[in-house]
Amino acid sequence: MKESQTQPPGTAVPGGFQTVKKLLKRPRFWYNRNGGVVVDEWKKDARRDVVFVDIDALVPKDHLLRKIEKVMDYEWLYERLDPYYCHDNGRPGTDPVVLIKMVLIQHLYGIPSLRQTYQRIQDTLSYRWFLGYGLLDTIPHFATVSYAFCKRFPTELTEEIFAHILNKALNNRMLDPTMIFMDGTHIKASANKKKYQKEKVAKTAKIYAEQLREEVNAEREKLGKKPIEEDDHDDDEPGGGTVERTVSTTDPESGMFVKGEHERQFAYEAHTACDRKGFVVGVEITAGNIHDSVAWDALYDQVTDRFPEAEFITMDAGYKTPWIAKKILDDGRIPILPYTNHHYKIGTYKPWEYEYDPKEDCFFCPNGGRLRHTTTDKEGKRIYRSNAKHCRGCPFKAVCGANEKGQKILSTHIWQEYLDLVEQLRRTDRGKEIYAMRKETIERVFADAKEKHAMRYTHHRGLARVTNWVRLKYAAMNLKKLAEWSWINSIFHHVFMLFYPIYVKTPVFAS
């Protein structure tokens, strides 16, 4: 086809290139905006060039790994791990700090596995620089890293790394532990949800069971009731003392988590606490079928032992139980919990429509009927019952919600006054302000962990391995925040930003 005589700007001149050979041999001709011809020579293939290069100059000055190197010290790691290496026998071992750095790279950049981390370090210059390796140095195999953490290093090393980074942030005044936010998030387990078996397991004993039993028996004694024995587990009742669980045959320590109406999967749950600035200050890992309120005590004790100055403890509705409210208030701290709906049958009297008389310890219904305190059960519930004879001729019987015997039954917990105080705190302006911070603190931690650091699912199996995996992930997140904030607060940052327009990231080659 005959070429057009006129060419629009930005296209080749007439008699352009016919073949790839001519394209490589001849220069390019382009029209510029002023109508002139610009010659652009083809760039030479430099993939096989041999050069002397300064590796440090190739890593950008504002790279995350540079910031981490400025805030981290590794001497304590050498001292801690020295007993686990032999210095006078066998072949030279791999530097333990290098192995730990490889794991930090995995969690900092959300790489799913150590195998992929090893592959990326091979051809990523900044990762090699962070490890202290040259372009031709052999990277430690991923199996070496895995073996070190599974067999050689002590099991408490991950907790020590987590605590060390947290203490650094505290010493740099980056933490605000006066406000603690707690919640749990599920992590999909490495287990087929179709491979399971049903097992009967013992019910989990409650930490506060002994204290509750003593207070319940004191009330039952006043009411003339028989005390509840310590070994009363109702073993004679069907299913008493045990509960049937769905147990994975692949990873028995995970738990079946029901997500929505239909989705079911085996998972672990990371019960996490963070401060007002988003630093993770504590974590407990359980199976996915363990309720938040059951795992709360271990997490609360861990955080308050580390930060006794904690003043506000903020949680969602899953933690709104009498025991949690009592323990926090008895410790002199303030629980911040949300509103929860009252459970009652639609079309009947609301629970708050019954008036309580503390002097006589009874309730009065809207029609004036009295509900007396008859007993207190082993769960700590005070049972109030009406007189069936009085209720028989009541005109409001249809909206009362009485049982088949014609009695109206109400129940409150033995520690109900603590929940009432929590409700008063919830209505304060300060309480509303603090609870609104959940979305930018603990919820943000979970979002970053899953979207940026690959915590949505785990390849590890077993509670101990998943616990170490999550702690290292949270340690990396805290380290990243610590490094970034230290960089922002440094004088070098301000100098860098001042000259950033003329800063050119070009390698410096040796002459």
Residue ranges and their predicted role:
Residues 20-51, 203, 212, 336:
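Short, flexible loop/hinge motifs at secondary-structure junctions
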Residues 90-91, 132-138:
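A Lys/Arg-rich helix-loop hairpin that forms a DNA/phosphate-binding surface
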Residues 127-131:
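Short amphipathic alpha-helical interface patches used for protein-protein assembly/oligomerization
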